[in-house]
Amino acid sequence: MKKFTTSLIAFFAVLGFAQANPGDTTWVQANNVRLDYFNNFDTTVTFPDGSVTYRKVLMEFTLGSYACPAGTQYCHQWDYTVLNYVMTPAGDTVELSRLITPFANSGWSRFPNTWKQPYLFDVTDYVSLLKNTASIRIHYSGYSGGFTANIRFAFIEGTPDRNVVGYDKLYEGYFAYGNPADPINNHFPVRNKTAPAGTTSAELKFLVTGHGSDTINQCCEFDNRTYDVLLNNTSVANKAIWRDNCGVNPLYPQGGTWVYDRSNWCPGALVDPIVHKLPGIAAGSSYSINLKFADYTATPSTKGYGGYEAHAAVIYYGPINKTLDASLEDIINPSVYPDHFRENPNSNTPKVKVHNSGSTPITSLQFSYGVKDSAQQQYTWNGTLAPLADAEISFPALSTLTSLSNSGASGTFGFRAKITSVNGQADEDATNDSLSSTFVAAPKWPGDVVLNLRTGNLGANGNLNQNPWHGVWKITDMAGNTVRQRNDASCNATYNDTVAMPAPGFYKITLSTPFCMGFHWWPYDGSSLQPGALIVKDLTGTNLPMKGYTYAGSTLTDRGEHDDFGCEYTQYFYVTSAGTSSIDELATSYGILVYPNPASDQIHISVSGISGKEATVSLVNALGQIVYTRQTREQQILVPTGHLPAGIYSLIYNAGDSRKVEKVVIAK
């Protein structure tokens, strides 16, 4: 056990966590083991003695891999359940956290020999168990090895949101579902409890994941089932045991079926507990509680019934300790933290997560933020944030981030954010007001890019060889205006679209598919479903690298991870000057007439050759700033210009895959 009086910088810097500037922090090293087969891996740990109050206790679980002995099958290649427990000398055994290992196939870009994936859990509610001497158990359910596990804890001194005054474990174990001879609800009987002294509120925390498969519904891993929380024999909640966002998992691509949604888990992701508020419970309250799963009779497979791994407990809280306080919880961007891999590198608009850690609703927050060792900007957010609630807040554009991308800067940089006032005044706890992160800047690209798209044969309606193809790409500016998109591609076709960015600034490429299987997904290699592929190039034909994206070979006969991004992919980039090439290359049979030119109060646009097609009309000044934009299907368009200063402007008319640009003069 080691104690520090500085920030958490050393603790999180290597992995890119947002770093706090808290009170004194005690760090405790726990397990550091190889997970070589199905087993319990126990480590005796000396924790703090409980004489100090902690604002927060964090558990960091770092997953990695090792080289298995020659001839070993499936080394770190399967999605196995990992349960993490604390076991006290008094006999308490409580599950602290849960995660599922990824399909970490060797040779894939996200899984080099040195790969590490951190998982961060807030275990503050269990601080009374994490004291003196206790054991931390990792239960690994794998039938092959190859993974490593490292657990350590950070005890951050200060005042927690609420004190935990008691804890009642209700249920724990793995229970088959759908067996008429042993209904699952037999294992979730009514529990009669009494809230301890000091209780002002109570919550049920339920860690549950479905595994295995029956014959018809693939229950429970791939089947969406529900349960009720019964408090005093009355349902206070009905919840589906389901996670619907596996296709946007930040740890991707993986070598298995990582895109499929599952029963409250995704491969390579931590498992979030399901939390239910229990109304009407206070000190001395006697109550009954149980969980009731929806009735279900399964047809067992050759491996039997599926089931649920469950751990449920009631946690009793005292009152909120602070009156007016906000906590800066996370920096979502800019950041290199792996859990924010899909959002980064981003543009010049930082985003943070804020928590109301007081009892007073928050209506305004003032922030200071900026790149380290540079001028800090100020921003005031106005809204409503209830006690103990969270919010994600985006800041206005930060000029220093623009400068870094404009210069093509490489390497890592530091970013800081700080809450400077809450509801117009200083809050009660300054130790939770600041965070910092490490980040890389968005890349600088040329103003003209070529998108080489080769489509497969899966139509957007799910049928083969029926147009349009299921994949879509879109380029937008930071105001959300569409610069160009290909959303009506034919199956089995090739497109080379040259796109000119209309002005200097940040842009975003978004790739998407309704089936959450990227433009290519390896399970279909060799089948009748043919893959697609996208490569982004400059005008010389040189590939422009996209973060976390593997380009295909020239013939699409290669296998593996190319174009495997799940539901959606984003790439931010910056251009220093507007492009020019697509104006002529994309000309079509339709035309636009712009008059008067010069103009004073308004510009009239007359469109001929097309009818009813949605288009975007933009007006860009000589500095590359978009001063007017609208979407329309009209053929006679009026653009107001009376409020604009005199000068030369570019009028841009985007209609689907085609683009027209006219120079106009505004004279006063």
Predicted segment positions?
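Bacterial Sec-dependent N-terminal signal peptides
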Residues: 1-25, 341, 580-583, 597, ...
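Residue-level detector of functionally pivotal "anchor" positions at catalytic/ligand-binding pockets or at interdomain
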Residues: 320-344, 442-449, 572-595, 608-610
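Intrinsically disordered, low-complexity Pro/Gly/Ser/Thr-rich segments with frequent PxxP/GP/PP motifs
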Residues: 375-408
